[in-house]
A protein has these predicted regions:
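Cell wall/extracellular polymer interaction/catalysis modules
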Residues: 1-88, 99-120
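Conserved "landmark" site that anchors the functional core of diverse proteins
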Residues: 95
Length: 120
């Protein structure tokens, strides 16, 4: 779990702070693909310190992580949503209150089960 220490208290003793310059590699051809990297990083990446609160807390699932396979897809994070009904780019998003509740209770190795979408 990663968190913004300038915005939220450490949600769990094992949570790691998101530092200035922390990035997440989404460059599938690079050796650091699907890993936390530091700026400057010349390949495709996502900034973990955002101006909005979406990444104030990030829970990292084991989807194609920590050993990434090219073509299997980027990491799936659990993070804060923009609001009800707003999609993510492949992650799982929660209200801030629900994310804080989850973050305060999970441990490394906690199993996350994502059910298939219900048919209309």
């Amino acid at each position: 779990m990663l968190y913004r220490p300038d915005r939220v208290m450490r949600p769990a003793p094992w949570a790691e702070p998101i530092r200035v310059g922390d990035l997440w590699s989404d460059a599938s051809g690079d050796a650091a693909y699907n890993q936390l990297v530091r700026a400057p990083y010349p390949h495709s990446h996502e900034r973990l310190r955002r101006s909005d609160p979406l990444y104030d807390i990030i829970l990292i699932t084991n989807w194609n992580y920590p050993v990434a396979e090219t073509g299997k897809g980027s990491a799936i994070f659990l993070h804060q949503w923009r609001g009800p009904g707003y999609p993510t780019a492949g992650c799982i998003a929660f209200s801030r209150a629900n994310l804080m509740w989850i973050a305060s209770r999970v441990e490394p190795g906690t199993r996350v089960i994502v059910p298939e979408a219900l048919a209309d």
